[in-house]
């Protein structure tokens, strides 16, 4: 997308004390109608890639805006317009850079809950993923590039009921983006509360 960014400055004065807060943000409408994504009423085809949190030289994701700007500009040069973050949420620098470049993001809750922990069985992972996605949305929810959310990757357990509640919670709580229960591989079943579906091997779907 072609970003138009705004800065809001709020100042609180109380006697001799003064506090100022400035926030940069964008305004956009991101929704689904039928089988299509629409951005500000315009039918939009998403062409994306996945970031697997693989940063072997540092062991962690870049924390500076310039590094993420470089990544997103390279992606745009190849005709891509969105990125899924596999089982993690990138640092704030990624959202800032995506807003500057014009790139759609899908962060996820930090879990791949089929290697021990399982969703919907009353394990700590259930509350943990809700707490984490609430926290990341509270922190980064005003960034226009934050358009999609999943609880994590390829769940197991009684996951269909759990991710259905997850999607229902977010649709009712924050309509600024669209939601899917979890990003899944080739053989996971459809979860009917999803607003969209993330699936590997999309060609021939």
PLM features: what roles do these ranges have?
Residues 1-86, 97, 101-102, 132, ...:
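Secreted/periplasmic carbohydrate-active enzymes, especially glycoside hydrolases
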Residues 73, 82-205:
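Substrate-binding/catalytic cleft of secreted carbohydrate-active enzymes
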């Amino acid at each position: 997308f072609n970003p138009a960014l705004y800065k809001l400055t709020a100042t609180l004065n109380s006697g001799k004390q003064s506090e100022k807060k400035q926030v940069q943000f964008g305004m956009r409408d991101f929704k689904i109608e039928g089988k299509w994504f629409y951005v500000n009423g315009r039918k939009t085809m998403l062409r994306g890639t996945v970031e697997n949190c693989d940063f072997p030289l540092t062991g962690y994701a870049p924390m500076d805006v310039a590094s993420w700007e470089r990544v997103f500009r390279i992606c745009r040069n190849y005709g891509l317009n969105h990125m899924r973050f596999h089982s993690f949420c990138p640092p704030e620098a990624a959202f800032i850079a995506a807003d500057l470049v014009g790139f759609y993001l899908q962060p996820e809750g930090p879990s791949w809950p089929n290697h021990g922990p399982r969703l919907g069985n009353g394990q700590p992972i259930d509350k943990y993923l809700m707490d984490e996605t609430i926290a990341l949305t509270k922190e980064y929810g005003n960034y226009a590039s934050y358009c999609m959310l999943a609880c994590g990757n390829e769940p197991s357990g009684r996951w269909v009921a759990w991710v259905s509640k997850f999607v229902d919670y977010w649709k009712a709580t924050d309509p600024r983006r669209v939601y899917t229960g979890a990003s899944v591989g080739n053989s996971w079943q459809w979860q009917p509360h999803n607003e969209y579906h993330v699936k590997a091997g999309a060609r021939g779907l």
